[in-house]
Amino acid sequence: MSSSVEQKKGPTRQRKCGFCKSNRDKECGQLLISENQKVAAHHKCMLFSSALVSSHSDNESLGGFSIEDVQKEIKRGTKLMCSLCHCPGATIGCDVKTCHRTYHYHCALHDKAQIREKPSQGIYMVYCRKHKKTAHNSEADLEESFNEHELEPSSPKSKKKSRKGRPRKTNFKGLSEDTRSTSSHGTDEMESSSYRDRSPHRSSPSDTRPKCGFCHVGEEENEARGKLHIFNAKKAAAHYKCMLFSSGTVQLTTTSRAEFGDFDIKTVLQEIKRGKRMKCTLCSQPGATIGCEIKACVKTYHYHCGVQDKAKYIENMSRGIYKLYCKNHSGNDERDEEDEERESKSRGKVEIDQQQLTQQQLNGN
């Protein structure tokens, strides 16, 4: 899936999201802008919009969504008023079918709506504050399944109605017939879909193949991210590069190779678990266990997101060095290489001196 997304910078800093018409990046996620500068939208505003489905084509995309689909959803939103601020652009509806509440993403937060986000399962749902209690039981069921089987391919049993993103009805009160027609069209599209595939990391809702515990995609990305290694005993899977650059994984020596991509399986599982709390600097999704090598830097990435964000990867197999420097610190790698070279020479000299001293002691005895 090609990506034409670029970070907002320079003259584009004043651009506003086509949905919420704001610059609330802290609440709504990164503001993504198309290459032609004509479309801008917050990542969260797109992820939770009712009629947006992830794009799997090679055409231009915005945060994993088709530019054309984003434009259609923005246009649909011009006729949908927010239940909290009463402004247009409210394409995020309560997931209870009979509820007519619709929001902007930040308005849903301010109105204390319940946000359900499970990227590895492609689930992005909102329940208004009135229906929080209704959603509680299904949330508990989902959480249990997510904790136990996050890395396990979805089975037909797991695709119960309560775990799907359901189509939302919008508030048609006071809208023209044309508006009702447009809004209903968006709802009809959702009803024809068996699953709301919102995650740009997912390939297909019917795809039951193993997915990487870090980047949440499967073997289709092997060429760019390395072989997908599968550990059936723990229902775990991970791409080689995702493990190689992950901060906490331990690569085994040549004399003790494991069957899980030459990595200590325990450290891989620990990293996957840690990754659930680590959101990517670029895409805001969990699983970002690759951190910038500069200690003071807080940027973390998925392997492919680091590449996309022009971070610099240092890979020296002979010396076992695998590092990432974000684009702001990419100039520091040369200095680190020099320091490591000096340290390596110093260690080598100490070892030689120790060997000579030991030999002299043996000869003296």
Curated annotation (Swiss-Prot):
Amino acid composition bias (Low complexity), ranges on this chain: 354-365
Q: Where is this motif: Nuclear localization signal?
A: 13-16, 129-133
- Which ranges are annotated Basic and acidic residues under compositional bias? 342-352
Q: Which residues carry this modification: Phosphoserine?
A: S138, S145, S155, S183, S199
- Ranges where the record places region Extended PHD1 domain (ePHD1): 14-132
The condition associated with this protein in its record is: Boerjeson-Forssman-Lehmann syndrome: An X-linked recessive disorder characterized by moderate to severe intellectual disability, epilepsy, hypogonadism, hypometabolism, obesity with marked gynecomastia, swelling of subcutaneous tissue of the face, narrow palpebral fissure and large but not deformed ears.
According to UniProt, the name of this protein is PHD finger protein 6
Species, as recorded: Homo sapiens (Human)
Top-level taxonomy: Eukaryota, Metazoa, Chordata, Craniata, Vertebrata
